[in-house]
Amino acid sequence: MIFKLIIKPKGMGHYLKIRRKLKRKKPEFLRTNWYRKKAFRNDPKWRWGHGRDNKFRLKMKGKPRPPEPGYRSPRKVRGLLPNGLKPVIIHNVEELTKIKEGEIAVIHHAVGKRKRQQILEKAKELSIPIANPVL
């Protein structure tokens, strides 16, 4: 008897839910001695330990976990916003016309007030969603 394996294609919402669950469980990756030095406390980005006796590097019990590939989100939703749209950085009105369905505009931080206002008006005409519409 031959059994057929039926795989149903899962939608984007399914993978977004999985990513949300994984992110809840993911620890905050802190560098070595983050609690000792004020500079490390204020800028707690991950740095791998290089010392000979570094307990983080040796992955000793009781020490924080280092970042590993297992903590990554599903490939289909990697780089997407929580609403499932892909962010596209916009610098001017012309770039706004190149946005496709399934993408959301993000106005670049260096765009001034006047140009930002023009982009917002054009986006309203074309009914394109904008992630950071605040003036």
From Swiss-Prot:
Is Ribonucleoprotein there in the keyword field?
A: yes
Quote a single Gene Ontology cellular component term: cytosolic large ribosomal subunit
One term of GO molecular function: structural constituent of ribosome
Keywords, comma-separated and alphabetical? Ribonucleoprotein, Ribosomal protein
Instruction: Map out region (Disordered) in residue numbers.
Output: 51-77
One GO biological process term is: translation
From what superkingdom does this record's organism come? Archaea
Family the entry assigns: Belongs to the eukaryotic ribosomal protein eL32 family.
Its recorded name reads Large ribosomal subunit protein eL32
Native source organism of the sequence: Nanoarchaeum equitans (strain Kin4-M)
- Give me the gene this protein comes from: rpl32e
